[in-house]
Amino acid sequence: MISAVTLSVLGLIAILGYLGIFTALHVLPTGRHPVRHAVSDYAVGPYGRIFRRGLVISSVGLLLTTLALFQEPGSPPLKSTPLVLLLLVPVARVGMAVFPTDLEEEKITRTGLLHHLFAVAAFALTYTAISQLTPDLADISPWSSFSGLLHALHRIILVSLVLLVVTMTPRLRRIFGLFERLFLVSTNVWFIAVGAGMVAAAA
């Protein structure tokens, strides 16, 4: 069996790699605006392959980190329900990759609607799992030493998710991308903190 530390290190590398790709998509001439456009819009066009690779790398990182947490990093052991929810996130992301989104100026299609449904599922699963895991991890060493960070990230994730939903309305749609990006960055930083804690536990 691969150790939790090894899984965590590989997971950290993958998540950091994803954030690198995420940053690159905002630097490359994609024609997408970081405030107005959804992140999934990067999948449509010449940079779609880069976006999909980032989606795969991010999912692998999440899976590795989750598998590490399954190895009961502390006492009491973590509940299995939020970990199972995290395992379902990559499944939802597969749906997002298979069914590309519709761009703002295009008519909504069945494919685009399915993409949005899978995206909603991925976001909801991610938030629910983080919401349930944060208080438990905060009571387990070594995460207890930076429990304030985990709780702060959890609050940022909640606020960004709420604002993300609010800005889905037509009047506020022009700033939807900003809060979607805040949600994605804050959740990935949360996973990085968790993975770093796993590595620190074995140090």
Predicted ranges, named:
Residues 2-31, 36, 43-202:
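Hydrophobic, aromatic-enriched alpha-helical segments typical of multi-pass transmembrane helices
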